[in-house]
Amino acid sequence: MKEKIYEYKDDHNWFISQWSKVGSSTYYEEEAEETYSSIEQSLRGLLDEGNSFILTVIKINSNIALVRFILKMLNEEQQDNFKVSSHKGAILVTQGQQLLLVCLPKKGITITDFFEKEKKVSELGDTILIATRNEGKTKEFSQMFAQLGIKVENLNQYPDLPEVEETGLTFEENARLKAETISHLTGQMVLADDSGLKVDVLGGLPGIWSARFSGLDATDQSNNAKLLHELAMVFDIKDRSAQFHTTLVVAAPDKESLVVEADWSGYIDFAPKGNNGFGYDPLFLVGETGKTAAELSNHEKNIISHRGQAVKKLMEVFPAWQNAH
């Protein structure tokens, strides 16, 4: 038996393994064993004769994380070159030009969806996975990308992917962390954004903490209420200047990530107005229009918003980025 211990640990997964002549596995959670052991057994089919490993799964939240962990060990011990990617929600294991294993999600995939022909990235017709579970944000991106024939998916369609902790200290650090981590896990092109509201008189707050400005269990309503409270003694609208900021990062396997940024200037109103949008939209007065972002139609907002401007910049530089890498 070789002495090397393999370990992978993040906030949602923890695996330990050791190369062995005799195989065994231990799952600390019975439900996890029922869910994930079949994938483990399928991967054991890739072992050379006489090889095996001992696997301990302390906690698990991601099929693809387990697959990557086991394949990394097999590649090192057997000098293989197994690769993993995601396709239409399925996990594919390949070596060279050979497709060796397909792990389907629990509910399966329709034949039509699985074999649907994909467009080339260079045609800007590929599917982009948006690194968010926020349906409001996804809707905005979908409307923008639809004009370019780009289909948008979000993380709600990939329930096995782990949550990526936003531990960065800047918008770019957080966006990079999300895009590059998820691209690495899925093998897909991923677009992540980190957006927030910067209020000048508050020194740029809420900034990267915009989504949780009022606490860990923050809602749009509680965040808006806290913002109004912080500005309660600021009576001149000109002193309530603010900017919505977006940093977009596109990450893809074996490519240097693409980064674009944009700001949308305005002011913080004294009370919420409008029913469209989400987040701080009801409080954000757009420039000198007198309207809040929540009073604009989706079409109007997409043209001038921080995300609209950032996506426009992205589309201008994307072809050169794709061809250069």
Swiss-Prot record:
Its EC number is 3.6.1.66. Residues 1-128 are annotated as: Unknown. GO terms for biological process: nucleotide metabolic process; purine nucleoside triphosphate catabolic process. The keyword Flavoprotein does not apply. NCBIfam families: PRK02491.1, PRK14822.1, RdgB/HAM1 family non-canonical purine NTP pyrophosphatase. Belongs to the HAM1 NTPase family. This is dITP/XTP pyrophosphatase. It comes from Streptococcus mutans serotype c (strain ATCC 700610 / UA159).
